[in-house]
């Protein structure tokens, strides 16, 4: 954000980006951000499309704060140019460049934005399938196991439960006890008061609010990219409806978040599934058929949460942040 134009008015700090040349003809956009917690500070993240013949309005991608009562998505954003579905901007026409506007309010001082990312997708395209990355086959990453159903107050806590597992993995590896958070605490810290705990960039923003940690939403091309992360020793949260993870079931429209922790010797997927009922003898760690995971994951257009210390594996395709 160093190149953003900065203005101050009525206690607000407004950061306006230069026009960002899109690398592809996108029609779906998800914004991600990482900022340190700041008492009373509220950050509104907005994006608009810039076409050769006109500009769209600024759409609000989220209102973020460490104060749960001030943190929310914005509904009712629909016009001829596009609409916002909770955390995703869908445009009626592909091919826009992008401009971002960040507005801080509510405090005397504001923390720096330490990371800002955009995930762009052309939902009309069918990416070519890449060869399997067999270095990940037979590898499983030790990751704590937790169930959303262990908490009587839970309401669709698959996302914060998955996030709790991954953060605790990094807590153990980095010897950082502040990352070992129980599920209810994570649920409160990612809550979108208008939607619940499944707002994708709210989950990654919370993970990235910790010093030295990065978190953001990405869309991958196929399972080979997921294998790259597992081969690098990094568990990945994937958006894949639970009812499609087993064969013979039909889509219902309900989403689900799970943690991919590895692959079997034959390429099936090892998952920590938060939708586990211990009273029924179920286990968090499960093996799902490769093709079932691919089918379920495609429902979210291969959406993932990438959460790691601020170092990552090489990116051969330019689909994630590869700056060291």
Regions inferred by a protein language model and the residue ranges of each:
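Extracellular beta-rich ligand/substrate-recognition surface
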Residues: 2-12, 216-221
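Short linear interaction motifs
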Residues: 9-14, 25, 80-83
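Histidine-centered active-site/metal-ligand motif
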Residues: 41, 158, 256
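A short beta-strand element within beta-rich, extracytoplasmic domains
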Residues: 24-37, 100-102, 242
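Noncatalytic regulatory segments and standalone regulatory/sensor domains
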Residues: 1, 13, 21-24, 40, ...
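Short, surface-exposed tryptophan/glycine-enriched loops
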Residues: 75-95, 228
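Conserved active-site-adjacent core of cysteine acyl-enzyme catalytic domains
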Residues: 17, 177-323
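Active-site-adjacent structural segments surrounding the nucleophilic cysteine of cysteine proteases
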Residues: 103-200, 242, 251-253, 320-323
